[in-house]
């Protein structure tokens, strides 16, 4: 990613980015995004070795970017600096793997039952904490042999076709969620094709491997551009994947004109599943054959969802379900930030950041928390013992299964 050298001159030194930073609020030693971003960037541009070990503690939540009144790309400056920062060997090796969840998924799903058993063992977690600096308190999500396929049914010319970008978690951990996305869109008149894409690249950026993120972006752009040329829009069910496709592809590919133009086209043609369905709701085309239910929900908006500037589509959709009461928690970052919360040296920071959210959930006493981000779900369940689910699952469960999909009537 290339940051405009003059962007630092737009910094007013107002410190509003520090006020918005979740880590700054819980760790008095953390210098904050203003210092790690534009202040040190002035020295970096002069060739001064000014990188700090604190760079690694940036969550990558982009709250600093949203807060900045002058649009300074603070998080991008930090991400670029993080990519140049040298780490101890053990952390570098761990972060190399964390930057490649697709590769990790392929290896663990060769024999998923054995992989899951090994990763769940306390002894294995102990050795991972000693050898790889992975927090022993964390439990890895179960891996499943990838079996998400484009359904043969309902691929008719009359339906609007969309290209589903599944992401690594759906592909290797929750393919059932991917099938539910397809079923939900099917019930609302869409034909869904599953994209043959890899990792979006967010974990690579988060772990300081911008070069790997660039390679991932190029591979994905080739596939997604073909879908757009075929007249499809792209839909995502993961807030981080959606952020990458809409916002960050252009940043990591801006030095390559051909790919940068394609990335811009992809950004303009990408929607979250919730955005797509809110559009149907506003047009009066949403399938509202919902059965009455008695469910008390709390909704948590992930940071990467907020960074897309699309409002809260899932909060509005879940409010349409009869018998459902839902509270928008608006309690800040959960602190997990993908692989961040798995790192031993960051576990306590991760939990401290999430404490405000945990307290709000415990006060609200919902039966369930709805949130689009898989690692937000993991953190919420880890910090509160309250079940967290993707809104797709909740909305799909609300349909009257006796009634057919919209365009089959």
Where is each model-derived feature located?
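Iron-sulfur cluster-binding electron-transfer modules in prokaryotic oxidoreductases
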Residues: 74-409
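Cysteine-centered iron-sulfur cluster-binding motifs in ferredoxin-type domains/subunits
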Residues: 5-24, 50-72, 172, 304, ...
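A ubiquitous short alpha-helical element
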Residues: 46-49, 63, 96-100
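Short, charged low-complexity linear segments at domain edges
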Residues: 1-3, 28-50, 309-316, 351
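Short, intrinsically disordered, charge-biased short linear motifs at domain edges
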Residues: 1-8, 45-55, 185-188, 319-323
């Amino acid at each position: 990613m290339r940051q405009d050298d003059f962007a630092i001159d737009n910094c007013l030194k107002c410190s509003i980015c520090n006020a918005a930073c979740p880590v700054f609020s819980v760790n008095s030693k953390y210098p904050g995004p203003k210092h790690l971003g534009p202040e040190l960037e002035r020295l970096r541009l002069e060739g001064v070795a000014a990188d700090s070990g604190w760079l690694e503690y940036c969550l990558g939540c982009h709250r600093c970017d949203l807060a900045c009144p002058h649009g300074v790309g603070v998080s991008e400056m930090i991400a670029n600096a993080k990519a140049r920062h040298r780490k101890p060997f053990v952390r570098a090796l761990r972060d190399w793997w964390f930057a490649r969840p697709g590769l990790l998924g392929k290896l663990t799903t060769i024999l998923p039952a054995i992989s899951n058993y090994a990763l769940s063992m306390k002894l294995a977690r102990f050795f991972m904490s000693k050898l790889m600096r992975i927090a022993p308190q964390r439990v890895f999500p179960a891996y499943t042999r990838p079996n998400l396929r484009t359904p043969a049914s309902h691929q008719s010319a009359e339906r609007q076709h969309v290209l589903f970008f599944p992401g690594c978690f759906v592909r290797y951990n929750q393919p059932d969620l991917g099938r539910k996305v397809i079923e939900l869109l099917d019930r609302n008149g869409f034909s869904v094709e599953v994209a043959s894409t890899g990792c979006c690249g967010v974990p690579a950026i988060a772990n300081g491997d911008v070069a790997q993120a660039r390679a991932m972006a190029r591979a994905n752009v080739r596939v997604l551009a073909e879908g757009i040329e075929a007249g499809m829009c792209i839909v995502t069910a993961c807030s981080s994947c959606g952020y990458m496709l809409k916002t960050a592809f252009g940043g990591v590919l801006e030095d390559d004109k051909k790919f940068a133009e394609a990335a811009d086209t992809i950004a303009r043609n990408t929607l979250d599943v919730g955005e797509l369905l809110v559009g149907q709701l506003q047009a009066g085309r949403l399938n509202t054959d919902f059965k009455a239910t008695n469910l008390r929900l709390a909704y948590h908006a992930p940071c990467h969802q907020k960074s897309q500037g699309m409002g809260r589509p899932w909060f509005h959709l879940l409010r349409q379900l009869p018998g459902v009461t839902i509270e928008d928690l608006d309690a800040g970052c959960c602190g997990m930030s993908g692989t961040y919360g798995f790192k031993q040296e960051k576990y306590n920071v991760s939990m401290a950041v999430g404490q405000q959210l945990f307290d709000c959930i415990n006060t609200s006493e919902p039966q369930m928390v709805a949130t689009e981000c898989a690692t937000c779900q993991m953190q919420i369940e880890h910090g509160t013992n309250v079940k967290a689910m993707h809104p797709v699952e909740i909305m799909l469960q609300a349909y009257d299964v006796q009634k057919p999909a919209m365009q089959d009537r």
